[in-house]
Amino acid sequence: MTVDTIFAPATARGRAGVAIVRLSGPRAATALTLLAGRLPEARRATRAALRSPPSGPGPTGPGPEEGGEVLDDALVLWFPAPASFTGEDVAELHIHGGRAVLAAVLGALGDLPGLRPAEAGEFSRRAFLNGRLDLTAAEALADLVDAETQAQRRQALRQADGALVRLYEGWRKTGIGLLAHLEAVLDFPDEDLPPEVETAVRGGIGALADALAGHLDDRHRGERLRDGLQVAVVGAPNVGKSSLVNRLARREAAIVSDIAGTTRDIVEVALDLGGYPLVVADTAGLRETSDGIEAEGVRRARARLAAADLTLAVSDGTVENGADDPAADLTGEAVLRVVTKRDLLDPRAVERWLARGALPVSTLTGEGLDALEAALESRARAFFEGDGTPALTRQRHRSALMEARAALRRAAEAPLAELVAEDLRLALRAIGRITGRVTVDDVLDVIFRDFCIGK
């Protein structure tokens, strides 16, 4: 099968000090020689004047004096296969990051025969197909590029380092061992194997199912770390929810008005507290209303409250015994009680609220905001810190493990050894899909389509 040589910027487009253009494929060496005048020593950065290729290169490629227009003064690197990111011949051009320079170099590469621009994620896809990455490592690479907080960075690096694949491959090898023992019973019925073999296999299958169940019972911790802990800010109308969100965001994200019912849709802001990502949602005030649009906002607020990982239940601090305060009805470990208008409270009122477990804040002066942020960070840390095992990071992994767990539980209860073996095979197949041991093109398309072009 003919493999194209692909090229793309590996850095973000736009004005920058340096841009990197990556090439991968069988004509990478030829392209590098044509532009740089020679093939540099492998894995050693070499300075070269990049020139547009001549219309008719000689059999050994042009020398520097034979090339066309100078495009840039660059550093070039050459990574011969298989010791490269993709497992193919790879070249990198480190050029000045101006738009015109990048456009000129990409244009010159596009004029060369056998080269084409890469599709999104195509470099990583080739790395997977050539055995340089498993699927979890490829996904971790995408997560690392997207990481905005330190906790996200640490999780992505841990997954890229193979923490998940080691866990899943360990389970898969355990399952293969169990299947081998079971198939020995099925394939050699006359060998008088002890009956304890099948009993031990069933016990091992049950233990494996329990291990998967424990891994799945994680409150979606890994996915939340990728996407942000969902925090809903709820309460009655006009208690200062939008002002509180604006204070947390350090910007005017939500409209603030003295008119009750101003907020009618969800307004989200992303926060980084102590390296943990939070998505804080300002919601419509909870009340009965005949206004159709406001009623829809209240419905959405209740839906966001039901789906939230953490709730900020906000009340007006100047009203200590509000009979119709919806925030007062919200309790539990996933609720932080917040009262606003601290600047209007005397010290004794502040102490009374604190004694009731509430956090008094002033959105006008910022007083109490540090304590609220510290409480949010503490809740986020408690949510994200696990038992030390790698976290599930994608719904694709979760779905496959749920499928494997169901198959293992069927296997543990199956009346016939043949049925046990079949369900065990299904479980192993599901686990193998996570790392790419078992895969189909449709799965690869979904995984790699959201990558950067140069990844």
From Swiss-Prot:
InterPro entries: G_TrmE (IPR031168), GTP-bd (IPR006073), GTP-bd_TrmE_N (IPR018948), GTPase_MnmE (IPR004520), MnmE_dom2 (IPR027368), MnmE_helical (IPR025867), P-loop_NTPase (IPR027417), Small_GTP-bd (IPR005225). GTP binds at residues 238-243, 257-263, 282-285. GO terms for cellular component: cytoplasm. Keywords: Cytoplasm, GTP-binding, Hydrolase, Magnesium, Metal-binding, Nucleotide-binding, Potassium, tRNA processing. Residues 228-381 form the TrmE-type G domain. Disulfide bonds: none annotated. Its cofactor is K(+). Its main location: cytoplasm. K(+) binds at residues 238, 257, 259, 262. Gene3D superfamilies: P-loop containing nucleotide triphosphate hydrolases, Probable tRNA modification gtpase trme, domain 1, tRNA modification GTPase MnmE domain 2. CDD domains: trmE, TrmE_N. Residues 43-67 are annotated as: Disordered. Belongs to the TRAFAC class TrmE-Era-EngA-EngB-Septin-like GTPase superfamily. TrmE GTPase family. This is tRNA modification GTPase MnmE. The gene is mnmE.
